[in-house]
């Protein structure tokens, strides 16, 4: 490319007192134009190659982002989302395993139930139910023990006392034609005490003296009735 200065209005017959400023004209040679055309496709090809590399890098990044993490099979999520999922899962588990009190009007629930099929009742109403059952049982017993049953109980006691008296009389007297009744333990003890007292020396001497006195009285009576009878 060469720059040539060409004066305006040049010619042999033109003459002016003031000289016009020169105009610069760019003239491109054929070899320079061909070189410029050869450079432009190269630049376009390099730009296309750079764009292709950028797209390939984006695709690789997408593949890396969508791939499974090393720690598990689920996609990465924020801590807030994980906490929300855990809370929802825990709530669903509690709804599946929770039991509501069967007492009418009570809304207390629990998840600590050993047997899911059996009905559950809270501690307050369970104790209340036991107390009501106990009071009802006591009232039924009180109602059943009054009235005719009390009279029947008195009759039973009277019959038992009569039977006891008859059995005691039979033991002491015995029936006709039967052997004598066996003495009771108290009677046996009294008989043993009586025998031991009779065998004591003091009682023996006293009895001997009494016997002698009786003998003397009998002799005196005989002498009075029969004066000449021998003693």
Curated annotation (Swiss-Prot):
Basic residues biased stretches: 115-138
GO biological process, alphabetically ordered: positive regulation of DNA-templated transcription
Compositionally biased intervals (Acidic residues): 50-65
Linked residues for Glycyl lysine isopeptide (Lys-Gly) (interchain with G-Cter in SUMO2): 157
Xref: InterPro entries: RFXAP_C_sf (IPR038308), RFXAP_RFXANK-bd (IPR029316)
Keywords: DNA-binding, Isopeptide bond, Nucleus, Phosphoprotein, Ubl conjugation
Statement: the UniProt record of this protein carries the keyword Cell inner membrane: no
Free-text description of this protein's post-translational modifications in UniProt: Phosphorylated.
Location in the cell: Nucleus
GO terms assigned for molecular function: DNA binding; DNA-binding transcription activator activity, RNA polymerase II-specific; RNA polymerase II transcription regulatory region sequence-specific DNA binding
Motif (Nuclear localization signal): 123-138
A Pfam family annotated for this UniProt entry: RFXA_RFXANK_bdg
Recorded superkingdom: Eukaryota
Quaternary data: RFX consists of at least 3 different subunits; RFXAP, RFX5 and RFX-B/RFXANK; with each subunit representing a separate complementation group. RFX forms cooperative DNA binding complexes with X2BP and CBF/NF-Y. RFX associates with CIITA to form an active transcriptional complex.
PANTHER family: REGULATORY FACTOR X-ASSOCIATED PROTEIN
Role: Part of the RFX complex that binds to the X-box of MHC II promoters.
Protein name in UniProt: Regulatory factor X-associated protein
């Amino acid at each position: 490319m060469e720059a040539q200065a060409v004066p305006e209005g040049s010619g042999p017959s033109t003459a002016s007192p003031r000289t016009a400023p020169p105009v610069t004209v760019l003239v491109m040679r054929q070899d320079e134009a061909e070189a410029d055309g050869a450079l432009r496709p190269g630049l376009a090809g390099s730009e296309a190659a750079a764009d292709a590399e950028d797209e390939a890098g984006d695709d690789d990044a997408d593949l890396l982002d969508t791939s499974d993490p090393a720690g598990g099979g689920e996609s990465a999520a924020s801590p807030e989302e994980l906490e929300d999922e855990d809370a929802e899962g825990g709530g669903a588990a509690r709804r599946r395993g929770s039991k509501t009190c069967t007492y009418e009007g009570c809304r207390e629930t629990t998840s600590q139930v050993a047997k899911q099929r059996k009905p559950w009742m809270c501690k307050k109403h369970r104790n209340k139910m036991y107390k009501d059952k106990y009071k009802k049982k006591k009232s039924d017993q009180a109602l059943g023990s009054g009235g005719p049953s009390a009279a029947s109980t008195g009759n039973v006691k009277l019959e038992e006392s009569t039977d006891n008296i008859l059995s005691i009389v039979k033991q002491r007297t015995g029936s006709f034609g039967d052997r004598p009744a066996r003495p009771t333990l108290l009677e046996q003890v009294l008989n043993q005490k009586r025998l031991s007292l009779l065998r004591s020396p003091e009682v023996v001497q006293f009895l001997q003296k009494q016997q002698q006195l009786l003998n003397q009285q009998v002799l005196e009576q005989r002498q009075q009735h029969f004066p000449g009878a021998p003693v």
